């Protein structure tokens, strides 16, 4: 079989790694801010600052990790050693994040959050950057790579869906008492344990079951194989001075602001703005399932019919409009009663369109 023609097994093995990455990102974006702010009592400004610092470290580490991986030489190639190593610091970071020492002052808790979130972002970068590069190297065929990234996108969202269902249907309703479940510190213990097991299994499975593709992967030339600090900075400078990449970077910056704000405030919106129960918040995952499915099915076809820039611009507009549509309708007085199942249905319908746009955009 031609190296360009990939088996379903390879596509599935590559994709399952994104499940671990998706679960990690869901933990970071969906729970961390709320846990430290509403459960542990850290002020919103300090919580936000800690998360910002971690994201800045993440932004710097991504190109450095890419440059190191591009130049790395080993019997396992230049991607797989990092993919195999990533689960261990990731698990440690999640444990530290959800089990801070007792008796910390507010600034002590602030420092602990900074340390644990930086470690988490750096750890998942250790997997995500080589894994993404691996996807681009699995085949030289453009449409085959689009299919590979469709699997990656689908499995990434599966990580989100699995964590969402586990947390909102099984954990938070179980711990509900005088307060809603998400406000009890004890409810986050099983979440941390489950996420650590899921992330480790998915990342290690992806690394193990794609290692048979190593002989087909590109290797660095002898001149590129030496890792030097100066080369790392040259790579970063070369990237940011590339006009097309700079435009893409600016676009990704604003898109990341949109996505990060939406994901971080999602638990606040469901709990305090919409006044939904944990079960009702759990059912909101339907919009993601519908949207991800349509994105998985349609993306390759859209790429065959339209240029990528057209697809990207259209889906960004759709994502922006429909993600905020429910809240805008509520503020204008056109939404169903808060806490009602009619409201849940409206959020699901509008959110499905937004999720489809986001899924297509992510793959593109």
Regions found by a protein language model. Give the residues of each.
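Membrane-embedded alpha-helical bundles of multi-pass transporters/translocases
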Residues: 1-364
């Amino acid at each position: 079989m031609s190296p360009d023609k990939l088996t379903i097994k390879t596509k599935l093995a590559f994709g399952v790694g994104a499940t671990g990455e998706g679960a990690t990102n869901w933990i970071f974006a969906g729970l961390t801010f709320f846990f430290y702010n509403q459960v542990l009592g850290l002020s919103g400004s300090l919580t936000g600052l800690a998360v910002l610092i971690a994201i800045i470290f993440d932004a710097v580490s991504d190109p450095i990790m890419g440059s190191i991986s591009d130049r790395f030489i080993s019997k396992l190639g230049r991607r797989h050693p990092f993919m195999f190593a990533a689960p261990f610091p990731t698990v440690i970071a999640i444990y530290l994040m959800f089990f801070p020492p007792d008796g910390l002052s507010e600034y002590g808790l602030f420092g602990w959050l900074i340390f644990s979130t930086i470690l988490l972002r750096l750890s998942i970068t250790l997997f995500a950057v080589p894994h993404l590069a691996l996807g681009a190297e699995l085949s030289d065929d453009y449409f085959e790579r689009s299919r590979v990234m469709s699997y990656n996108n689908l499995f990434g969202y599966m990580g989100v869906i699995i964590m969402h269902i586990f947390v909102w249907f099984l954990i938070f309703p179980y711990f509900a008492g005088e307060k809603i479940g998400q406000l009890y510190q004890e409810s986050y213990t099983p979440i941390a344990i489950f996420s650590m097991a899921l992330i480790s299994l998915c990342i290690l499975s992806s690394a193990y079951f794609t290692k048979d593709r190593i002989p087909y992967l590109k290797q660095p030339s002898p001149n590129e194989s030496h890792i030097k600090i100066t080369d790392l900075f040259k790579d970063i400078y070369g990237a940011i001075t590339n006009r097309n990449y700079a435009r893409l970077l600016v676009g990704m910056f604003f898109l990341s602001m949109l996505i990060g704000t939406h994901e971080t405030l999602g638990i606040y919106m469901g709990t305090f703005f919409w006044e939904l129960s944990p079960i009702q918040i759990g059912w909101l995952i339907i919009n993601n399932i519908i949207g991800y499915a349509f994105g998985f099915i349609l993306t390759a076809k859209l790429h065959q019919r339209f240029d990528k820039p057209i697809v990207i611009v259209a889906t960004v507009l759709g994502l922006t409009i429909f993600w905020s549509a429910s809240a805008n309708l509520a503020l204008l007085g056109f939404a169903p009663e808060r806490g009602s199942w009619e409201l849940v249905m409206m959020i699901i319908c509008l959110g499905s369109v937004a999720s489809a746009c986001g899924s297509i955009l992510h793959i593109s």
